[in-house]
UniProtKB/Swiss-Prot annotation:
This is dCTP pyrophosphatase 1. Its main location: mitochondrion. The modification Phosphothreonine is found at residue 12. The lineage of its organism: Eukaryota, Metazoa, Chordata, Craniata, Vertebrata. Inhibited by the reaction end product PPi. Inhibited by dCDP. Inhibited by triptolide. Its EC number is 3.6.1.12. SUPFAM superfamilies: all-alpha NTP pyrophosphatases. It comes from Homo sapiens (Human). Induction: Up-regulated by an increase in cellular dCTP pool. Keywords: Acetylation, Cytoplasm, Hydrolase, Magnesium, Metal-binding, Mitochondrion, Nucleotide-binding, Nucleus, Phosphoprotein. Substrate binds at residues 38, 47-51, 73, 102. Homotetramer.
Amino acid sequence: MSVAGGEIRGDTGGEDTAAPGRFSFSPEPTLEDIRRLHAEFAAERDWEQFHQPRNLLLALVGEVGELAELFQWKTDGEPGPQGWSPRERAALQEELSDVLIYLVALAARCRVDLPLAVLSKMDINRRRYPAHLARSSSRKYTELPHGAISEDQAVGPADIPCDSTGQTST
């Protein structure tokens, strides 16, 4: 659980969070808010020097590992996260938050505008996995019947690579 301005945010533990059906995120904080909060946090501790893309990626992978540990050894017969104990739900919320924070920090360091990148990638995915060909199928787009596009046809906007300092290279 996170605390913002003295208010507990996130999983309220109420029935709505465990109810099946539609879920939507809070409108705030935005990804830009998260980027700024993390940048301020790191600056206050003089940690920017350690936040090279490689280090941020390794920290992200470590947090994904901690998230995976929450699911490890659970059986298919056990309830999903909605049925977990409040302690397990709090751990889930913290690890998902850590993953998002490091993902946003890595994207910022590499100068990738995540909201725009997501829109571009979803467009590519729609072309790779047309609903009429991919519905109820777990097959990769290269294995779908004729009509799905190939990888070389699904090229998105030009990437702007970053060097080890996080600066864009030209």
